[in-house]
Amino acid sequence: MRTLSSQLYSNGGLTWFQKKNQSSLFIKHLRVSKPSRVQLISAVQFRPCIDIHKGKVKQIVGSTLRDLKEDGSVLVTNFESDKSAEEYAKMYKEDGLTGGHVIMLGADPLSQAAAIGALHAYPGGLQVGGGINSENCMSYIEEGASHVIVTSYVFNNGKIDLERLKDIVSIVGKQRLILDLSCRKKDGRYAIVTDRWQKFSDVILDEKSLEFLGGFSDEFLVHGVDVEGKKLGIDEELVALLGNYSPIPVTYAGGVTVMDDVERIKDAGKGRVDVTVGSALDIFGGNLPYKDVVAWHHKQHSLH
């Protein structure tokens, strides 16, 4: 495994990965292995989503989400459903869609209850994220989540917090952990963003960081935050980066508007990047027929 820049990774004021032997000892202790890109040669999948805000299934412009203690007046909502999270989960199960994600866009009890309802409706078929940490991660697995999704918890002061990452891997296992590496462009590079996508970290999404983080997680989830929720088209450059360098399965979300965008993700990602569609779908108030995306998904699998 390559040694990463010591500027990226810190813990408790100590710098990690300054020397190759330090990296080797840490990796050996965690018992993680360097992933192989061979894992990614499979059919591209459509990964459905259920975004929950204050107990309701919504589609929002994620970059406008602020802490719930604020008045929320800046929140831009594209859609609010009259269907429950549980109903969406049942639909995804009936349509044979796996690996979708349930995201709680707030830590309120209503959102937590809605997420758990979805997990109960489709045990083992959905991943869950939003406020996940070492204390609550196993409870969501026990409620039926296939994986837990974490982002802000494993970042601290703009760096990767290795103690937290090590801790959560030891609890749920690499095979049930997904790292959300959602990012925004900054100075021409993609920087991972945390805290409801409001804070830039110092961690740049590139070949080295993807390779390193792939040793700790089963999959990546990456929202192109600059285009997410805006239905302006995909971030093709980001998709290409993921297709070229992700050593484990990765799902891209952001900007899909028409079926051609889904095909562009397949092509730009070299068949290695799965796709999530949100606001554009007719089940979320958009114009893109959900049934067409499901049919496309099953067609990909029939080709393999």
UniProtKB/Swiss-Prot annotation:
The keyword Transit peptide applies. Na(+) 1 binds at residues 59-60, 228. GO terms for molecular function: 1-(5-phosphoribosyl)-5-[(5-phosphoribosylamino)methylideneamino]imidazole-4-carboxamide isomerase activity. Its cofactor is Na(+). Binds 2 sodium ions to optimize substrate binding. NCBIfam families: hisA_euk (TIGR02129). This is 1-(5-phosphoribosyl)-5-[(5-phosphoribosylamino)methylideneamino] imidazole-4-carboxamide isomerase HISN3, chloroplastic. It comes from Arabidopsis thaliana (Mouse-ear cress).
